[in-house]
Amino acid sequence: MKKLITLLLMFSFGFIQAQDKLISANFKKSIQKGVTVVEFNAPFNSANSYSDYKKLTHCDYYKVCIAGSPELKKKYKVYSVPTIIIFHNGYVERKYKGNIMLELDVTTNELQKAVDELYLDKF
């Protein structure tokens, strides 16, 4: 019984975590409407993953693992991680690349400003 509960908890946690991850199959649909912020990263760089995404408003936020989606890495020319791309109605509007230390130089305020400019564009 203890093993069953442990497995159920692990499955539930994994499902919740996976909801914000994109793969090629669901990528296009997820970026089609409104402002979407997508972080491209790799398992070896998870320590430098963008952590303040919950502070962003007026946008959807997703993650793409480049190891699991090499075709997206190629299509969007992701050469360093992390890379954040802001889409507006399916089109690339802004791109922020990780530096030589595999860290993002963009601040949450800068990301929010870019999101707000695109979001307000609909009015």
Predicted regions and their residues:
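Structural micro-motif
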Residues: 76-88
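N-terminal post-signal-peptidase region of extra-cytosolic proteins
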Residues: 66-71
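Active-site regions of enzymes building and remodeling cell-envelope glycoconjugates
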Residues: 56-64
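Sec-dependent N-terminal signal peptides
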Residues: 4-13
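N-terminal leader/targeting and pre-domain segments
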Residues: 17-33, 110-123
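Non-catalytic, surface beta->alpha helical segment in thiol-disulfide oxidoreductase systems
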Residues: 86-123
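Local sequence-structure signature of Cys/Sec-based thiol-disulfide redox active-site neighborhoods
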Residues: 21-57
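Extracytoplasmic/secreted cell-surface and envelope-processing proteins
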Residues: 46-49, 72, 94-96
